[in-house]
Amino acid sequence: MNVNGYKIESGADLQKANLKHAYLKGAELSGANLSGANLVLANLFEADLSNSNLTTAILDHADLSEADLSEADLSGANLHNSYLRHTHMIFCNLTGAVLDHADLSHADLTGANLTNAVMTGANMTGVELTGATMPDGSLHE
């Protein structure tokens, strides 16, 4: 699915949508409801997903590099092997999210909540974690 050139209304309801392999590069999805959506292998490079609801969304192998996920809710989301390089995830809720083998290199997770997140094998090179709540519940200073 290629939605390049289409306008997606702010706060769109895409709950449980099948967007597998979707080309959403640079998409404006701020405030969208994508809870439970299938975004496996989706291209969300530079997409604006700030304040969006991505609870329990499936984002395996998705490219979210340089996307804005500030204040987004990704609790319980599956981001296995996803690309989150240079992604803005400020105050993002990642409670219980699966981030195993995800590439988070140089992402900004300032104030993010990672409580109970699974991060086995995740690339954390250069990640900003000031004020973030870590998987074990401790606060990163």
Language-model region placement:
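Tandem repeat scaffolds
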Residues: 1-141
